[in-house]
Amino acid sequence: RPNPCPGILGHEIIGKIEQLGDEVRNDLRGNPLSLNDRITWTEYFYSGQSYYRDIHDMPQKSPGVRKYGHDLVEEDPHFLGGFAEYCYILPGTGILKLPDAITDEEATPLNCGVATMISITEASKINMGDTVVVQGLGLLGLYGCAIAKARGARLVIGLDSVKERLSIAERFGAD
């Protein structure tokens, strides 16, 4: 994916609503949005029709999709990266209001790392009672362990050459 320069990096973003557009009323789940609500949003924005959006429910793969943290700062709107003080959220972006029980640190990876592993575990069709092997227990592997266990895997086997990661993986559901 191109990463034009100069740009404002950052695509796993948490923020507070400073201003709402006239047509923005609710988040992805239908929760009402208000000023100062703590939110996160999809790392991409795409509002047109496309084969990927309409057939596969994957608008992020559509031709012409734009992604936060991957745009020129010189193009309007200028604030499209998470490292900016403010970020302009464009139409076609999914917004999710965060509950107080989830910290910023816990919520930050939801749009990329966790979403990636949810997609992988769904495609793998993990069922209740299955045995799952997760090779590599870095951040994505840890999410994979937790999600596989939450989906009903009876046994989650974590593999990694770094010994310390094995004990960490146990806290994420690896057996």
Go through each PLM region and give its residues.
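Mid-domain Rossmann-like dinucleotide-binding core that forms the NAD(H)/NADP(H) cofactor-binding site
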Residues: 86, 99-175
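Cysteine-cluster motifs in flexible loop/terminal segments that predominantly coordinate metals
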Residues: 32, 42-96, 100
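ATP/adenylate-binding site constellation spanning eukaryotic-like Ser/Thr protein kinases
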Residues: 10, 55, 92, 113-114, ...
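A general structural signal for stabilizing positions within well-ordered secondary structure
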Residues: 7, 30, 77-78, 147, ...
